[in-house]
């Protein structure tokens, strides 16, 4: 899963480097757009595709099919997937019911994998060594059809490592770390 942030971009680069610059045929880089992503995030994901020559499949939540494929040009930019989810739920995500990630990113990505014929897969998540609480939380859950891998945590990669990598690149996410990718997120 590609979140559109620096850490997931760094994780993708490491994965590409481990496989001679290309993704294995059974590996899918998937970016789930909420429709509330900052334009800088969309530009960053598009730049990764263009500069690294990697195929990233863009998806959005679809009420009926679970997901729909979109592109950089057709991706929602006015909050449509988020608004549709709020209409379906009849309330807003909040600190107690944080359903936006689950319903706008995780479930569409799972629907994408099932549509490709997978009944079991590993979801690789860009959580770092300095995010131990988040890693423990993710690893403690039963994810059903998929397993979770946190290779950056296992490799003891920290925020400083990720920021150092991007400082050496000819492009970067044009956001400060505290800003977050989704413009409505109350977690940042």
Task: Give a label for each model feature.
Residues 1-188:
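Nucleotide-activated chemistry modules centered on ATP-dependent adenylation/adenylyltransferase
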């Amino acid at each position: 899963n590609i979140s559109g942030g620096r850490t997931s971009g760094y994780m993708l680069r490491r994965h590409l480097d481990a496989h001679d610059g290309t993704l294995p045929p059974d590996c899918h880089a998937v970016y789930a757009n909420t429709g509330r992503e900052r334009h800088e995030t969309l530009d960053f994901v598009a730049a990764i595709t263009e500069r690294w020559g990697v195929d990233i499949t863009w998806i959005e939540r679809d009420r009926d099919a679970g997901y729909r494929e979109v592109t950089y040009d057709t991706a929602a930019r006015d909050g449509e997937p988020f608004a549709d989810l709020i209409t379906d739920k009849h309330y807003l995500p909040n600190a107690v019911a944080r359903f936006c990630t689950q319903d706008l990113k995780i479930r569409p990505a799972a629907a994408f994998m099932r549509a490709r014929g997978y009944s079991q897969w590993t979801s690789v998540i860009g959580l770092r060594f300095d995010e131990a609480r988040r890693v423990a939380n993710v690893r403690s859950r039963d994810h059903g059809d998929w397993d979770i891998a946190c290779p950056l945590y296992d490799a003891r990669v920290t925020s400083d490592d990720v920021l150092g990598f991007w400082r050496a690149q000819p492009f970067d996410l044009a956001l400060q770390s505290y800003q977050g990718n989704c413009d409505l997120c109350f977690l940042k």
